[in-house]
């Protein structure tokens, strides 16, 4: 292992691309087998479904999940679609379309997104519907809203707001949103996707360039020359 360490700093090192790939692949397999598979097996043994919304090394990190998930939709109404894609599409966790695609590939019924955290206390039901519509059009059919706080005392008030619970001025209207979201989920679940285009996931190439998969593949090496490339 020590003999291969220079490959992480010098892309001209012998077999540097393979060494880098093997490093990320090893971390990915260890994470998936030592954590996800064990939790998934325990859930199955106890008749529970294993739902995950986790950082992923690659698309197949959630292979052992019964419900695959992601974390996106954290903005006020009006952001251009181009901004949404630029902000979220490069990260497995925040790419709603990648989540629904993975669910389809694995034959899973549900694709889940956790949404609404950190939008702020100015978030309205109109903002919520706008984000839900976008998730539904991306194939998401299970919606996990962040969060329903039992209290907003002290620092809790500032922990990735808003609360969707009693403290929210829109709470008395929440049934309308809940009914709408329920209908959206049923519709998407019972809709067949007409997929005509396949997009190659370039994760292998990004790994060889030391792209960090947990944070949208930014370069994580120390070579200024390679970073410019």
Kindly label every feature range from the protein language model.
Residues 1-229:
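Carbohydrate-binding surfaces of carbohydrate-active enzymes
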């Amino acid at each position: 292992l020590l003999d291969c360490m220079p490959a992480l700093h010098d892309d001209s090192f012998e077999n540097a691309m393979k060494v880098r790939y093997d490093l990320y692949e090893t971390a990915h397999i260890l994470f998936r087998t030592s954590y996800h598979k064990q939790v998934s097996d325990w859930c199955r043994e106890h008749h529970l479904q294993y739902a995950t919304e986790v950082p992923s090394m690659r698309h197949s990190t959630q292979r052992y999940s019964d419900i695959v998930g992601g974390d996106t939709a954290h903005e006020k109404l009006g952001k251009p679609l181009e901004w949404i894609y630029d902000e979220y599409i490069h990260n497995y966790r925040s790419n709603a379309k990648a989540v629904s695609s993975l669910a389809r590939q694995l034959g899973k019924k549900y694709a889940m997104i956790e949404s609404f955290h950190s939008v702020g206390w100015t978030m309205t039901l109109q903002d919520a519907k706008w984000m839900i519509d976008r998730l539904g059009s991306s194939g998401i059919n299970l919606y996990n809203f962040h969060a329903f706080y039992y209290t907003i005392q002290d620092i809790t008030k500032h922990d990735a707001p808003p609360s969707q619970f009693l403290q929210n001025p829109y709470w008395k209207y929440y049934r309308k949103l809940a009914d709408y979201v329920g209908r959206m989920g049923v519709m998407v679940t019972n809709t067949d996707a007409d997929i005509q285009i396949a997009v190659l996931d370039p994760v292998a190439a990004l790994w060889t360039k030391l792209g960090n998969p947990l944070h949208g593949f930014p370069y994580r090496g120390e070579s200024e020359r390679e970073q410019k490339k």
